A protein has these predicted regions:
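Extended, low-hydrophobicity segments enriched in charged/polar residues
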Residues: 1-127
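Acidic, serine/threonine-rich low-complexity disordered tracts
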Residues: 132-135, 140-144, 148-189
Length: 189
């Protein structure tokens, strides 16, 4: 696998002795796996590269939506009442804005929520995060979801419509806390 992707993005060299590769299946695809690659020699040190793999084809998750939509069309995606929240979390994490992921913040102990912060900030985050919810379907068959989003240094409550094809639309977002002294740091490219 490493020989297929080395160097990642033309700049991150892999090494059989130091590069860690992990994979897992995703419940909204039958044959697609998510591959996670990390190496302590890379800068920034918290960089993690991700790929989707479908029957040998690799799709680099680089912050853009195109690789996900390509896999959704090819695999194809199968969104259900039971897996829509996991798909929403996946999509929002891997499709980036200028300031990083749209982290669906369900728990203050999430690995991507900063741990170093003052007590007031911790209180705001702990008092805001909550499990994302599936609220049912609309007349178009879109899955309606509600979630707390941690983007950059702000928290929002957002409402989403997830289409069966995997397209996601943020219907509404209300800021809860802005200009926090911490932000989500989870580089993928």
């Amino acid at each position: 696998f490493l020989s297929q992707v080395d160097p990642i993005d033309g700049k991150f060299k892999t090494n059989e002795s130091t590069t860690q590769v992990h994979w897992r299946t995703l419940p909204f695809y039958e044959r697609v796996a998510l591959v996670r690659i990390q190496d302590p020699a890379w800068t920034p040190h918290n960089l993690v590269a991700y790929y989707l793999t479908d029957q040998g084809a690799l799709y680099r998750l680089n912050g853009l939506s195109a690789p996900i939509h390509d896999v959704n069309a090819k695999a194809p995606i199968k969104v259900t009442d039971e897996n829509v929240i996991e798909y929403l979390k996946f999509f929002c994490f891997f499709v980036r804005g200028e300031e990083g992921p749209f982290l669906i913040a369900e728990d203050s102990n999430d690995q991507y929520i900063p741990t170093e912060m003052d007590d007031n900030t911790r209180s705001v985050i702990e008092g805001t995060v909550r499990p994302a919810t599936f609220e049912g379907k609309n007349e178009n068959g879109h899955y309606l979801c509600d979630a707390v989003v941690f983007y950059s240094n702000a928290l929002f409550i957002a409402n989403f419509a997830v289409e069966p094809t995997g397209m996601i639309q943020m219907l509404d977002d209300d800021p809860i806390a802005a200009d926090l002294p911490v932000s989500v740091e989870a580089p993928i490219s």
